[in-house]
């Protein structure tokens, strides 16, 4: 199940008690699959091993998860004028998010953990991973 399946889960989980694992799985399907492909495609084109392709797929899934949580954080606390879209929709609709389950601060801490884990995985690439590391910080700190 990919992006469409993740969106289906998002809609079906509204106003439901959903576990952390299910929320994470939904976010990975909803957003992580897109980032997963974007990260794996260069490895596929370069004809890297299946193990290396899987490594980059996992990095992409985690970046997508981070992006989805960051988007939920913007919805929760963001300014509609700055974000360029209506905010505070998730809570009104009863969306299953890590914020609704863990609270805002714990969702931010979870994002910090995702960033730490991705950076740890990319450590072997040294300065070649600088742009990705900077992008991770941008994703979390963006306001639109």
Q: Language-model segments: which ranges?
A:
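All-alpha prenyltransferase/terpene-synthase fold signal
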Residues: 1-144
């Amino acid at each position: 199940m990919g992006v469409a399946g993740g969106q289906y889960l998002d809609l079906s989980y509204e106003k439901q008690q959903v576990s952390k694992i299910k929320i994470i799985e939904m976010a990975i399907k909803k957003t992580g699959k897109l980032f997963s492909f974007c990260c794996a495609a260069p490895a596929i084109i370069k004809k890297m091993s299946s193990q290396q392709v899987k490594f980059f797929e996992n990095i992409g899934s985690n970046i997508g998860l981070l992006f989805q949580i960051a988007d939920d954080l913007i919805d929760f606390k963001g300014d509609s004028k700055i974000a360029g879209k209506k905010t505070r929709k998730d809570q009104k609709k009863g969306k299953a998010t890590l914020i609704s389950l863990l609270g805002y601060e714990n969702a931010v801490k979870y994002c910090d953990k995702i960033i730490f884990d991705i950076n740890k995985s990319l450590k072997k690439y040294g300065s070649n991973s600088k742009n990705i590391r900077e992008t991770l910080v941008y994703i979390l700190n963006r306001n639109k």
